[in-house]
């Protein structure tokens, strides 16, 4: 992990011809995200469980992905999170695909989900979204068919 951070930082320093401060790193991120970059703090939080379950791919892709966010912020300020500046760092400097989402199995980090259906498929919503629907009458729509998601109540 530290070696990949160092290697990636050196590549960025050579490309931009300037020094970057090594970010603070912790492994306390929970949920389904693999990593999060905190731009103003120069800090990266990684998901320990996803790292342990997907070590090689995590180090190869997620570590530089999050570091790229910090480098972009320090070079260009506030820009789109996965915009052209970030893609430049990923593609040109790190020589990696500019993937915005990981493909890791999330069953061990996901938490309880609730089954919903629309006209075209089944969806599994987090407890947070389920509670918003139940308590606040929020509606969620399917991205494919634009149909309303309807709770499948197992107890009926």
Swiss-Prot record:
NCBIfam families: PRK04860.1. Belongs to the SprT family. HAMAP family: SprT. PROSITE patterns: ZINC_PROTEASE (PS00142). One of its GO terms (biological process) is response to stress. The gene is sprT. This is Protein SprT. InterPro entries: SprT-like_domain (IPR006640), SprT_Zn_ribbon (IPR035240), Uncharacterised_SprT (IPR023483). Its cofactor is Zn(2+). One of its GO terms (molecular function) is zinc ion binding. GO terms for cellular component: cytoplasm. It comes from Haemophilus influenzae (strain ATCC 51907 / DSM 11121 / KW20 / Rd). Residues 11-152 form the SprT-like domain. Zn(2+) binds at residues 65, 69.
């Amino acid at each position: 992990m530290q070696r990949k951070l160092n290697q990636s930082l050196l590549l960025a320093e050579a490309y931009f011809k300037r020094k970057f401060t090594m970010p603070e790193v912790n492994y306390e991120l929970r949920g389904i995200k693999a990593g999060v970059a905190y731009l103003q703090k120069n800090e990266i939080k990684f998901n320990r469980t996803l790292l342990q379950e997907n070590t090689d791919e995590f180090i190869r892709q997620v570590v530089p992905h999050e570091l790229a966010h910090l480098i972009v912020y320090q070079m260009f300020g506030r820009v789109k999170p996965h915009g052209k500046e970030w893609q430049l760092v990923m593609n040109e400097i790190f020589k990696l695909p500019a993937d915005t989402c990981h493909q890791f199995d999330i069953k061990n980090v996901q938490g309880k989900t609730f089954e919903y259906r629309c006209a075209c498929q089944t969806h599994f919503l987090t407890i947070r979204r389920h509670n918003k629907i139940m308590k606040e009458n929020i509606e969620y729509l399917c991205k494919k068919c634009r149909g309303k998601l309807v709770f499948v109540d197992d107890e009926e």
